[in-house]
Amino acid sequence: MTKFLSSYNGRNIYIKDFSIHPRRCGRLLYLEMGKDELANLIEKLRGWGELHGPVKKGKFHSFERFDSIDEIDLNYTRTMIPPKKYFTRPREAIMRVNLRKGYELLEEDPKRIVLFGLHACDINAMKIMDSIYIDEFPDPYYAERRRNSFIVGLSCIPDEECFCKSMGTDYAYDGFDLFLHDIGDAYIIRVGTERGLELIRGLDLRKPSKDSLKKLADSERKRSSMFKKELLSSHLPDIADSLHDSDAWKEYIDRCLGCGSCTLVCPTCRCYDVSEYVDLNMENGFRMRRWDSCFLRSHALVAGGLNFRPTRADRFVHRYNCKSAVNRVTNLPYCVGCGRCTVFCPAEIDHVEVLNSVWGVVR
């Protein structure tokens, strides 16, 4: 949980969050850093843990390990796979079994990692994942990895597929240790946690000038005006609750391949499957947890051969209902508007178009 901070090097420099984001105005510690100091910040972060950030690979970006600031793209829009891959592994063994020795739970021994350059939508998605994997029934693997992660957010410019503004996730109020806002000739740093404050001690930072704070406010207003897509998010509960059997879905269901790509790239999809494997000698085995997708026919298959979502249509509508729900802990929608499902859909199905079209047909 974020702890609001009081001072930096003995100076009180609380600054109220900007009124452009009036939903949760609090008081955070703001500092200004020249861009020539970024390399020194990276070195400080390297001392905390292994560095990971947005690296361009071909046409797309991926969160990968990096050593130099020159290896990452600070102007990226989105990665293909979200940062959840660091906390819920796509595939991992969680238990080993031996016929004579019994079973052994495989404990996590994570290294400390720094995730540098996360955008607000992904930070808000991680808050949702935290509420699922930590708040009620803690998952020891996830929780330990989160404890050993340091989150550095980075401001971004939306492209034509971003709709996080419609979902209320275009700004991160918490969920990070540090957040960097690019104001052209410098960065404004919002400090989110005590350990974030401790890490930046010794850097050449200063209290932001009035001119710098005006640049920050202006850049946030400009960014807010750049979103092209708009989802009628106030109607999402109605879509989820009452439109399951509407014929308005049919056009998109017919185009859908049922491949599950949208769930794999979604930063809040968290379904997994647990399987057990035994060696041919029948003496050794292990239990494996891996990502699953509600778009796959096997996902809803239960004992006796019953499948409670047997058709692609059932699975298609189910996913949109799931993403339209609101997380009761964070009060955020399960869709954070990152645009990944649209960008990486092989059938070119547009998430916003689907929901706006369905609502438009029946309203």
List PLM regions with ranges:
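Short, well-structured alpha-helical interface segments that form or flank functional binding sites
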Residues: 116, 247, 251-257, 261-264
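Ferredoxin-type iron-sulfur electron-transfer modules in oxidoreductases and energy-metabolism complexes
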Residues: 233-254, 272-363
